Amino acid sequence: MMWPMHTPLLLLTALMVAVAGSASAQSRTLAGGIHATDLNDKSVQCALDFAISEYNKVINKDEYYSRPLQVMAAYQQIVGGVNYYFNVKFGRTTCTKSQPNLDNCPFNDQPKLKEEEFCSFQINEVPWEDKISILNYKCRKV
């Protein structure tokens, strides 16, 4: 069977277009690259809830519960699991940590008791092993 002379050229052109298209898609989301993520995503929200819980259990030495005033940034990175990066501004509430229901605690508005803190968290989740942990955090008073 004899192929027309332009057939190899067409195949080569098609291959080059396919490779260029896939390289373009890869440049937008690199494996291991950090990119902004959606706070409404269930797994992102679970990682953020974990960071907030650990903040109040381990990092926040105050007797009052703190909750987020604002999540300023959220990123994720696919590694051997998922790394989540959060920048969160916390506010002190009127509820002490010993109270049973802390979800609806109002923020403390009294000047002497009002306190805010900015924290950056790196959370690692390995879903298939059911593991989640804080790899790194840094907090400062605002």
UniProtKB/Swiss-Prot annotation:
MF terms from GO for this chain are:
cysteine-type endopeptidase inhibitor activity
Residue ranges for motif Secondary area of contact?
70-74
Paired cysteines (S-S): 95-105, 119-139
UniProt note on tissues of expression: Expressed in submandibular and sublingual saliva but not in parotid saliva (at protein level). Expressed in parotid gland but not in seminal vesicle, prostate, epididymis, testis, ovary, placenta, thyroid, gastric corpus, small intestine, liver, or gall bladder tissue.
What the entry lists under SUPFAM superfamilies is as follows: Cystatin/monellin (SSF54403)
Q: Which SMART domains match?
A: CY (SM00043)
Q: How far does the signal peptide extend, from start to end residue?
A: 1-20
| Record's keyword terms, sorted | Disulfide bond, Protease inhibitor, Secreted, Signal, Thiol protease inhibitor
Q: By its UniProt entry, which PROSITE patterns does this protein fall under?
A: CYSTATIN (PS00287)
Reported temperature dependence = Thermostable.
Subcellular compartments: Secreted
GO annotations of cellular component type: cytoplasm; extracellular exosome; extracellular region; extracellular space; vesicle
Q: What are the residue positions of the site described as Reactive site?
A: 32
Question: Which proteins does it associate with, and in what oligomeric form?
Answer: Monomer.
Similarity section: Belongs to the cystatin family.
What PANTHER family would the database entry show? CYSTATIN, CYSTATIN-D
Q: What does this protein do?
A: Cysteine proteinase inhibitor that possibly plays a protective role against proteinases present in the oral cavity. The order of preference for inhibition is cathepsin S > cathepsin H > cathepsin L > cathepsin B.
Tell me the protein's name.
Answer: Cystatin-D
Gene expressing this chain: CST5
